[in-house]
Amino acid sequence: MTTFGTIEQAMAEIVAGRPVVVVDDANRENEGDLIFAAELATPELVAFMVRYTSGYICAPLTEDECDRLDLPPMHHTNQDRRGTAYTVTVDAREGVSTGISAADRAHTIRLLADPRTGPADLARPGHVVPLRARQGGVLRRPGHTEAAIDLTRLAGLRPAGVLCELVNDDGTMMRVPDLERFCAEHSLVLITIADLVAYRRRTEKQVELVAEARMPTRHGVFRAFGYRSDYDSAEHVALVMGDLGDGRDVLVRVHSECLTGDVLGSLRCDCGPQLNAALDQVAREGRGVVLYVRGHEGRGIGLLHKLQAYQLQDTGRDTVDANLDLGLPADARDYGTGAQILYDLGVRSMRLLTNNPAKRAGLEGYGLTVAGRVELPVRPHPENVRYLRTKRDRMGHLLEFDEVIEAPMGRAVVGDGIGA
């Protein structure tokens, strides 16, 4: 059985200028990164990192620092599967030779962590890859980028880190057994992002319960809990039915806001029927949560961008390519705020009402246990069958439905509404 160190031990190592090894969830990258504080970078630390990792050394910085240092994204559309926010690469403008040596990269990294550094002090491109960490850290995105920022901040240092993925001698990624052996050999502390999430949950609160009220609906009587997040301007609502008790085995639907489908009854998607089906299932069971996450319109691209994507779909593009054509991600949602709200409500393990496996992985990374997936039935309509096929075939949604005749592009088809 793997023995992991504590977050307190990791912070002590970071302050002492030593690296730690951080492993993420097995359902995410399932990789271990060597991480240390950027302001304490030395040629020896960088050389050690180069020797035992892929060598693609990155320097996580906060969003504010990336903006201050004029570090734009490496590409206008982030197509990285995990949403890692690479910026343009840099070298120190002065004090380096080619920029690639351990001493040169250590100098550049220290410069990135120095509050006196300005945009003109950096040359672009270079040999160090800054990463833009999500505001809110691992509570918003449980990635190594955010872990590096959280560890340095919690250790009382500048919130700027250095990281790279550990690899075996044959070039394959180190997994937990390999990481254990590596840490034992080099006397390094091994921690998990899940433990860092749990530590921050114990010591910080990122969401605020603003209001609670009785909410009678045509599905039954719920309690409505209104939340606001420190790192999210949107307001979110959780509809809770019954006593959640110990928070185990709770039926949960995390529903992304969709004005067109949920409110206007649009037939272009299946969002409205999914919301109604989830409320019905929770009401039948008499215990559960339907969490309505604001700010997720159009899988996170916003209402007007979604309408622009619809324009492209009317010319033949599918829902994925339409987003990409606009320079936007196929799916820009994160579930960090939603996970914090569920945790604040007392949910610890859940049966998740979803057809989207990525949603399960997105929630499990925040310390919540998904005990099982409950399928939401799908009834296709001529107006949304192409959308459903794309979700199934290109986005990995687990959908089974009877085929129907697709509506002509850009023309409305009169029909009965979509059922649940």
Curated annotation (Swiss-Prot):
Zn(2+) binds at C258, C269, C271. Gene3D superfamilies: DHBP synthase (3.90.870.10), GTP cyclohydrolase II (3.40.50.10990). GO terms for molecular function: 3,4-dihydroxy-2-butanone-4-phosphate synthase activity; GTP binding; GTP cyclohydrolase II activity; magnesium ion binding; manganese ion binding; zinc ion binding. CDD domains: GTP_cyclohydro2. Mg(2+) 1 binds at E29. Coiled coil: none annotated. Its cofactor is Mg(2+); Mn(2+); Zn(2+). This is Riboflavin biosynthesis protein RibBA. Catalyzes the conversion of D-ribulose 5-phosphate to formate and 3,4-dihydroxy-2-butanone 4-phosphate. D-ribulose 5-phosphate binds at R28, E29, D33, R141, P142, G143, H144, T145, E165. It comes from Salinispora arenicola (strain CNS-205). Residues 203-420 are annotated as: GTP cyclohydrolase II. One of its GO terms (cellular component) is cytosol.
